[in-house]
Amino acid sequence: MPACCSWNDVLQYETNKVTRIQSTNYGTVKWVLHMIVFSYISFALVSDKLYQRKEPVISSVHTKVKGIAEVTENVTEGGVTKLGHSIFDTADYTFPLQGNSFFVMTNYVKSEGQVQTLCPEYPRRGAQCSSDRRCKKGWMDPQSKGIQTGRCVPYDKTRKTCEVSAWCPTEEEKEAPRPALLRSAENFTVLIKNNIHFPGHNYTTRNILPTMNGSCTFHKTWDPQCSIFRLGDIFQEAGENFTEVAVQGGIMGIEIYWDCNLDSWSHHCRPRYSFRRLDDKNTDESFVPGYNFRYAKYYKENNVEKRTLIKAFGIRFDILVFGTGGKFDIIQLVVYIGSTLSYFGLATVCIDLLINTYSSAFCRSGVYPYCKCCEPCTVNEYYYRKKCESIMEPKPTLKYVSFVDEPHIRMVDQQLLGKSLQVVKGQEVPRPQMDFSDLSRLSLSLHDSPLTPGQSEEIQLLHEEVAPKSGDSPSWCQCGNCLPSRLPEQRRALEELCCRRKPGRCITTSKLFHKLVLSRDTLQLLLLYQDPLLVLGEEATNSRLRHRAYRCYATWRFGSQDMADFAILPSCCRWRIRKEFPKTEGQYSGFKYPY
């Protein structure tokens, strides 16, 4: 059993054969596209540092808020309302939050002196009543301030609500004060400490420089590396109004972006700060506008526990840290170069597109005859023929036909279904250019034979003379030398073919037909050229010479070996060859499919 694979099959190399076109226009297009691609690749390599191995940042954040605010508000004591002044420091307006966030209270609503007892519910929607039947004992509404007792009691002179067991008096639904009580909080400052680490590069740093002055304040232009921020400046950089946001509260994002170049020759690793609002700006359209929460201060009075409930409005600052650190890596550089080499194939794609477009049948028939400036583009047809080779699928229905009175070859790719091959139109294909180099190498006796008496020395064209039609020739014959086919009925239409499309002289009467196809010396020389030691008997010699004559005619009239394999010889030529090199029993098989 032969081996399925050998070292000769393994130790080999395959490459593509290319066509080189000497053209100034296409050469210019190629180099322009190459320069564009090279410029883009180089720019992207340097600007985006694609030669580096990137790693995301690992970060920790710590904040400290400083500032004092004086608050003036209405205070009720003994039924008398007067202005009260109070001082708020860091412990009063900041609250511990989880994650990279901190909160600054800017406004509040107090409910003082609450104690756990029974009292009427605040007259919100769904809490008002007219009798005890509207109140259900033990009912707990998520929107309620307590648990209903089942009684309907007066809330004021005009309204009644269900009695609840809760912190009384219940909290009233009040609007946040305008302007905000702690509107001076825009002058507060926050110190942000941000430590980052790139474990893959073993690099750690922070945003606070050793040379930083503790009295500096961040400014986008004058001091962009200072890590102390004024709250009002943060809102100004984000395009927001601190005074308006302070009334209902909101959420502000502080973005710290680290784009670190850790290469020793161009080291740079400093943060860049930016700010933007994260919550819904349209507080009037929001279902729950702003940002607020409740907390309580508990105390005892006459041994009774009481509390002051505070609804705090304020601004939550979320610190968002992101970025990458990059360092030169030879593997990343090789991968990038390898991935961009295919971009240079853009020139090939564009030039092939131009050649294919300007060599199309549409341009040949619809553009070039009417556009004089486009005539130089006809050279693309020549380039296309040199670049592309069309190969037909070797199907049993494929046949090629050549008429001596037509400059082209006809391709027939269909079932004949009893229809004579002579009348099938087929598709016109260009006749391949004949290569005479093989003939010139052979010492063939192709010199002119002596003229017979009365013979003219002028070349007589085959289409100039109309031969009389023989009475024995079939109806489809145009030269008068064809014979009816002897094949079975279902295959007979394949041999119903003449050498001419229109009436005229038969190709078998030409001198070249005799010298190339019927010359015994020429055919024997071709057989010996293939097998120098060939020795055959008379019958075998005739068979060899007959098939060689078939091949000589097909190669002569069709040029291409691919076409010659599927060429159908005219009846007149086929019978003339059989007459010269007959078979003993006189039975011939006809055309055989080569594959």
From Swiss-Prot:
Q: According to the UniProt record, list the residues that bear Phosphoserine.
A: 390
A single Gene Ontology biological process assigned to it is:
bleb assembly
Activity regulation description: Activated by high extracellular ATP levels (0.1-2.5 mM). The synthetic analog 2'(3')-O-(4-benzoylbenzoyl)ATP (BzATP) acts as a potent agonist. Does not undergo desensitization, instead, undergoes a facilitation process where currents progressively increase with repetitive or prolonged agonist application. Palmitoylation prevents channel desensitization. The permeability of the P2RX7 channel is modulated by the amount of cholesterol in the plasma membrane.
Q: Where is this region: C-cys anchor?
A: 360-377
List site positions: Selectivity filter 1: 342
- List the carbohydrate attachment sites: 74, 187, 202, 213, 241
- Where a lipid (S-palmitoyl cysteine) is covalently attached, the residues are 4, 363, 374, 377
ADP-ribosylarginine: which positions carry it?
125, 133
Q: Which GO terms describe its molecular function?
A: ATP binding; channel activity; extracellularly ATP-gated monoatomic cation channel activity; identical protein binding; lipopolysaccharide binding; potassium channel activity; purinergic nucleotide receptor activity; signaling receptor activity
- Extracellular topological domain: 47-328
Q: Where does Zn(2+) bind?
A: 479, 499, 506, 572
Q: Which InterPro entries match?
A: P2RX7_C, P2X7_purinoceptor, P2X_extracellular_dom_sf, P2X_purnocptor, P2X_RECEPTOR_CS
Quote the NCBIfam families the UniProt record gives.
P2X
What this chain does, per the record?
A: ATP-gated nonselective transmembrane cation channel. Requires high millimolar-range concentrations of ATP to become activated. ATP binding trigers the rapid opening of the channel and allows Na(+) and Ca(2+) influx and K(+) efflux. Has also the ability to form a large pore in the cell membrane, allowing the passage of large cationic molecules. In microglia, may mediate NADPH transport across the plasma membrane. In immune cells, P2RX7 acts as a molecular sensor in pathological inflammatory states by detecting and responding to high local concentrations of extracellar ATP.
Q: What is this protein called?
A: P2X purinoceptor 7
Q: Which organism is it from?
A: Mus musculus
Its lineage reads: Eukaryota, Metazoa, Chordata, Craniata, Vertebrata
